């Protein structure tokens, strides 16, 4: 099975320009290819991972990746299938975000070894050197307004309005392809399926300006089996930056993937062989309640993104919280595992009497209910049941001098911080 066949078998090929020519290029020698990442935030997220891992698969097959950080295009904003104009970021912010994204990409691509080691480029380097007049003369003249208006990504914005700034974005992305082809012999661009219009602007410019053929391959935008856009948890993006989405939160995200998606996601997001995945699928289908596919998926992706130690910690937090073993976890681990539960910062004037604190922290609705909860054995401090109405919280109840975990009943948690 050649690399293109494997990508297809994994569900990673959505659309290509001349497929026969692309397969020929990929099987006859080393291809230099690129994927672009606009710094629209200070971190990449799971939505970017499909293209990143596809890029890694091609590198493992011997091809040479260029990771393009859009320091210039990030200042403009891509209109593709966006309902409204993006708010423009400052140059300083975009450059800062570009640096952070560079660091994240080095986790996935090999920038050190071999004649196909990855190269990092920033389109700000060439766009900052070209004047507006030169850009219009040397690039703009190859694009007709009719051609630009025909793109689906533009059509959808015509009625609501699109600025010239965003309208011109596709020309900038097209010029990226031309520049990388001219300087580095890059002949293939990879990106999300929503980028097709911008990406083919590059092949058009290559054909008209340099009489060369460029290839484009898009990866699918991933949705779950209900059609919901993939990569968000509780409406929030799942970030690759551990400070924005902890390894534990990412682990839980994959662990909670629906049964109908789990095997498909193993093909897309892991480097397990297709034979291994077929074996997992057989075991998984025999006992879906054991969630084998989700557990392996969570292990593989968290290890890939954050490393083996982070995976082990996420697994330990999961197991200890499930067993109610609060005392086996550090304050840092508890912060990860209980990041979504109510948090109350204890004030110096607060009463440390347990009944009072249950009401103050919003764990029990009233003192009467709080007393009943304590007497009925429904209150736990750091996993230990407390039934003393006169119990006073003390330093002994603080984990690493930072927090106390109170549980009411089986599932209602609150974290007290100091």
UniProtKB/Swiss-Prot annotation:
- Name the principal localization, coarsely classed: cytoplasm
> Where's the motif 'HIGH' region?
39-48
Chain location of the short sequence motif 'KMSKS' region per the record = 229-233
Set out the biological process GO terms recorded for this chain's protein. tyrosyl-tRNA aminoacylation
Locate the S4 RNA-binding domain: which residues?
Answer: 352-418
Amino acids binding ATP:
232
Q: Name one Pfam family in it.
A: tRNA-synt_1b
Q: Where in the cell is it found?
A: Cytoplasm
Q: Which InterPro entries match?
A: aa-tRNA-synth_I_CS (IPR001412), aa-tRNA-synth_Ic (IPR002305), Rossmann-like_a/b/a_fold (IPR014729), S4_RNA-bd (IPR002942), S4_RNA-bd_sf (IPR036986), SYY-like_C (IPR054608), Tyr-tRNA-ligase (IPR002307), Tyr-tRNA-ligase_bac-type (IPR024088)
Please write the reaction equations for the catalytic activity of this protein. Answer: tRNA(Tyr) + L-tyrosine + ATP = L-tyrosyl-tRNA(Tyr) + AMP + diphosphate + H(+)
Enzyme Commission no: 6.1.1.1
Q: Which GO terms describe its molecular function?
A: ATP binding; RNA binding; tyrosine-tRNA ligase activity
UniProt keyword list? Aminoacyl-tRNA synthetase, ATP-binding, Cytoplasm, Ligase, Nucleotide-binding, Protein biosynthesis, RNA-binding
- Give the highest taxon in the source lineage: Bacteria
Q: Which GO terms describe its cellular component?
A: cytosol
Tell me, in a sentence or two, what this protein's role is. Answer: Catalyzes the attachment of tyrosine to tRNA(Tyr) in a two-step reaction: tyrosine is first activated by ATP to form Tyr-AMP and then transferred to the acceptor end of tRNA(Tyr).
PANTHER family from the entry?
A: TYROSINE--TRNA LIGASE, MITOCHONDRIAL (PTHR11766:SF0), TYROSYL-TRNA SYNTHETASE (PTHR11766)
Oligomeric and partner information: Homodimer.
Q: What family, per the record?
A: Belongs to the class-I aminoacyl-tRNA synthetase family. TyrS type 1 subfamily.
* Protein name listed in UniProt: Tyrosine--tRNA ligase
Give the species this sequence originates from: Streptococcus pyogenes serotype M5 (strain Manfredo)
Provide the organism lineage as a comma list: Bacteria, Bacillati, Bacillota, Bacilli, Lactobacillales
